[in-house]
C-alpha cells in the first residue's frame, strides 16, 4: 500500500451523468439523454478531513468479487467504524495491508480475495489496528 496525503476537497466540478445503463454490447441511440450532473466529491468523499487515497500493491485482493488490482487507487475513510465484510486498511505488526475484515465469536481475520493467499487470524499479542475503511476503488484502463 502506497500512502497519499489527506484529501483536499477538489474544486466543485460537475460532470454530465447519463441516465441510461450502458450495456456491454451495442449502444442504443435512443438512450442519449442526461440524468443530471455528478460531483466526484459527493460521490467519493463523505468526510474530507478523514479521507485519504492509497495505492494498492500486489494481487492478494484480486479474486472472485469485485477485485482490487495492483495499482488501483483506494479511497479510505478513517472515520468509519469497520464491520465484518468491509475492505479495510489494517496495520499488523507494523505492516500495512488491504484485506476484507471478518469478525466472529472465534476471532478476527483479515481475508484476501485471492485464494492463493492465506487468511490472517489476529492472535493475542499481535500489534493490530484498523487504519481505515475502503469506500471506493478507482481503476484506470490506460
For each predicted feature, which ranges?
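Residue-level "contact hotspot" at macromolecular interaction interfaces
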Residues: 64-68, 81
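Short, compositionally biased
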Residues: 84-98, 102-108
